[in-house]
């Protein structure tokens, strides 16, 4: 982690594949690989792990990196257009496109959305919506070009400390907690803290005196017993607002706990107790 500092390292391998090293808290994210697959269920293979570790060794030959240093691996499936003329998967375009099939057995065309990524999903959605509106003979009545996503709304770019101090005073919460949640959720931290400041009186009968890991189940400002960076009320807020169905949803898809290597059986048990009444039965 010290070797890259706060810089991202980007280079292209001889086979055309891109390799990235990104600082992530006290760790480093290393990626990526491109393998053609036919099934929706995938995992990071030993071959890919070996390849990426070798690439790191090329850039930092003086640093020993072993599989035992890996905290977390992730694999996803990205739909790309068929292009048999390319020698490697890395050479296939990532640009988004909507292939419209006009002649179908139905009374409407079929839109086939291919490619794209997180950085272009809003633009892609706008283009497809315009195409759909044109087919329906309708015109656009609004757009989201200037709509800020999530915690970027009303972000205090020049007065961050004042924002933190103000929220801490309004909700009688330690400013260190506010700062931590602000770093995690941006201005969305205000809603999280508001929720954390509310009592859990409705849970008296369910919790009783069976306190989990010595946590007070009625104090939502209490940190978790297994991960002190997260709080009881925060977990419940995310579980409710982000429509968590399984505990794993929170660990892997609503937080960075898995990526930081903090996914343990003890944590899962604790989270299950905290959000049990919010999960679908």
List the predicted regions and their residue ranges.
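C-terminal catalytic lobe of FAD-dependent flavoproteins
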Residues: 1-30, 34-213, 217-263, 267-280
């Amino acid at each position: 982690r010290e070797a890259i500092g706060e810089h991202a390292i980007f280079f292209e391998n001889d086979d055309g594949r891109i390799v990235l090293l990104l600082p992530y808290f006290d760790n480093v994210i290393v990626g990526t690989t491109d393998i053609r697959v036919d099934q929706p269920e995938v995992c990071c293979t030993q071959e890919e792990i070996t390849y990426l570790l070798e690439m790191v060794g090329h850039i930092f030959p003086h640093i020993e990196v072993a599989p035992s240093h890996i905290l977390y691996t992730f694999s996803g499936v990205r739909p790309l257009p068929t292009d048999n003329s390319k020698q490697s998967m890395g050479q296939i375009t990532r640009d988004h496109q909507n292939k419209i099939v006009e002649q179908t057995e139905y009374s409407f065309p079929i839109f086939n959305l291919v490619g794209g990524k997180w950085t272009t999903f809003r633009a892609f959605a706008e283009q497809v919506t315009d195409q759909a509106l044109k087919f329906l003979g309708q015109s656009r009545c609004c757009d989201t070009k200037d709509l800020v996503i999530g915690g970027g709304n009303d972000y205090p770019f020049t007065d961050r400390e004042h924002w933190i101090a103000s929220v801490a005073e309004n909700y009688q919460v330690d400013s260190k907690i506010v700062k931590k949640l602000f770093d995690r959720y941006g201005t969305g931290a205000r809603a999280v803290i508001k929720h954390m400041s509310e009592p859990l009186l409705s849970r008296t009968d369910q919790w009783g005196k069976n306190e989990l890991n010595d946590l007070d189940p009625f104090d939502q400002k209490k940190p978790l017993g297994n991960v002190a960076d997260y709080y009881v009320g925060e977990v419940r807020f995310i579980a409710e607002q982000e429509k968590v169905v399984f505990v794993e949803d929170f660990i892997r898809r609503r937080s960075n706990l898995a990526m930081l290597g903090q996914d343990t059986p003890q944590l899962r048990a604790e989270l299950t107790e905290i959000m049990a009444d919010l999960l679908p039965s």
